[in-house]
A protein has these predicted regions:
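Generic detection of long, well-ordered alpha-helical segments
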Residues: 11, 83, 87-90, 142, ...
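"Short basic amphipathic alpha-helical interaction patches in structured regions
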Residues: 66-73, 99, 108-110, 116
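C-terminal/domain-terminus segments
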Residues: 103-133
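Short Cys/His-centered divalent metal-binding micro-motifs
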Residues: 82-112
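Pan-zinc metallopeptidase signature
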Residues: 130-199
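Short, charged surface segments at domain edges that flank catalytic/cofactor-binding sites
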Residues: 1-43, 74-76
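Generic structural signal for hydrophobic core residues of well-folded globular domains
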Residues: 59, 96-100, 123, 166
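Histidine-centered nuclease catalytic patch
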Residues: 40-84
């Protein structure tokens, strides 16, 4: 997602943005899970740089994992409820979930935020600090957003505003996804962290 497109969609609600992305990329190529709750590899579009997002993540967390998926309706795994997106579109989806959680969300589940602080932001911090993956599918996904660091910062600024509004600690943004694997470190993200702090 480039800046021009972000400016077009920035005021969408979560469900409006899901509809927009499904019009842009189409619905799931298949159901995300099989009837036995295993991931269906036919749903993947990473060769195009796209990730698969569950539309019902505004209701429940971690729907791409068997353990959490099984605790929720199978309908949420259907192709019609899969939204394709690039990494920055995925980040915006999760920010919008934080801003527009479903009134029917699972009790005691804080939807949206975990995707931002545990997965998407830590990886993009590393990527925009110079980390290069050796996984072909991930490289294809990164290549799709390589020229859109400005959009990343706009999204981070927006998410910081959400955290501040909810009196949550913005330090959760200063992370590295690959540090736990010994492939990168927070220190290597320091310059980016300074830019985030200034937003």
């Amino acid at each position: 997602m480039n800046l021009q497109e972000y400016e077009k969609v920035q005021n969408f609600t979560y469900l409006e943005y899901c509809d927009y992305l499904q019009k842009k990329y189409g619905i799931g190529l298949s159901d995300y899970m099989t009837k036995s709750w295993n991931k269906n590899n036919k749903v993947t579009r990473t060769k195009e740089g796209l990730l698969a997002h569950h539309k019902f993540e505004d209701h429940a967390i971690l729907l791409s994992t068997r353990e959490f998926a099984m605790q929720n309706p199978f309908e949420w795994q259907l192709a019609k409820n899969i939204v394709y997106c690039d990494y920055l579109e995925h980040l915006l989806l999760h920010i919008l979930i934080c801003e527009y959680p479903s009134n029917d969300k699972n009790v005691l589940e804080f939807v949206g935020i975990g995707g931002v602080v545990n997965f998407i932001v830590p990886e993009l911090n590393d990527y925009y600090s110079g980390w290069e993956t050796n996984q072909n599918w991930r490289k294809t996904c990164h290549d799709l957003i390589k020229n859109d660091k400005d959009v990343y910062f706009i999204l981070i600024k927006r998410f910081k505003a959400f955290l501040n509004k909810c009196s949550l600690d913005t330090n959760v943004l200063y992370s590295s996804f690959n540090e736990k694997y010994g492939l990168w470190s927070k220190q290597q993200n320091e310059s980016l962290f300074n830019e985030i702090a200034a937003l």
